[in-house]
Amino acid sequence: MDVVRELQNPDQGWMQRYEVVQELGDCFASVGEYENARRCYEKAAWLEPDEAGPYVGTGVIELQQGRVEDAEVAFRVALRLDAGSSRAHAGLAMIAQQTGRHREAFEAYLKSLELDSNNLTALLGLFQVSCQMGTFSQVIHYLKVYLQMHPGDCSVMFCLAALCARDGQDRQAVELLRDILSLEPEHTDARNLLEEMEHKAAHVNQE
């Protein structure tokens, strides 16, 4: 598909709709066709200058290609257009995390999740930063909120179990690990952590 020709062709009415062009850009970005994605986002921004979506998309592909400064500019433009963009806050959080500004990343991930508790990128980013900072209570809350909406997500369940274990909430961690193994009996990480916790509990009981 010649994206440039299609985008510039006035006879292609469907390519003159913001939603179509924006979604096409997201599709290209998801498969790593960044130049085609960029052209779509530029067209989408021209069609709807006040929409944040094209700038969020541009920020994502700039970040994927290692152009951190350009990504940050794009995410900040998105936030000027829409201060409630969860994805833009998550994008700035990822940049802060990559550049070692953990406190700033933590706050930006929290803001992203306040706006959309279903944002898995922000949730896992907050998990990583929380582990680096040793701050667990807020990410535990958002992991629980996410699991209320996605109760069978074993990857998030394991993140929550690991944090509970580190935070001294051993009973809840064990319950989560057993739930994971009932859903995925071959989940090696969950099995190993459960064995470690059961061994720890047995040692404590012996004392």
Regions found by a protein language model. Name each.
Residues 4-20:
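TPR-adjacent "capping" and linker segments in tetratricopeptide-repeat scaffold/adaptor proteins
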Residues 2-5, 31-43, 65-77, 98-111, ...:
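Structural signature of tandem alpha-helical TPR/SEL1-like repeats
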